[in-house]
């Protein structure tokens, strides 16, 4: 492999901010924050959804924050988005 062209593949601490679940895995993500976990310092990546909080994996329904995205879409496109497609 050529030197200097590949991203740094290292252990990173991921924290699910919705339930404070933490896990370490290898990643190339770039982050400025670090955190201590099990006596070792890792680069820190904060995520909103993980397997510990996603409804598919937990079997429980939780309200996900998607309403903001829908409202943003409606504000941007207005009534054009609700019109029916014309068949050719």
Swiss-Prot record:
It comes from Paraburkholderia phytofirmans (strain DSM 17436 / LMG 22146 / PsJN) (Burkholderia phytofirmans). Keywords: Ribonucleoprotein, Ribosomal protein. This is Large ribosomal subunit protein bL31B. It comes from the Bacteria. The gene is rpmE2. PANTHER family: 50S RIBOSOMAL PROTEIN L31, CHLOROPLASTIC, LARGE RIBOSOMAL SUBUNIT PROTEIN BL31C. SUPFAM superfamilies: L28p-like. GO terms for biological process: translation. Belongs to the bacterial ribosomal protein bL31 family. Type B subfamily. Gene3D superfamilies: Ribosomal protein L31. GO terms for molecular function: structural constituent of ribosome.
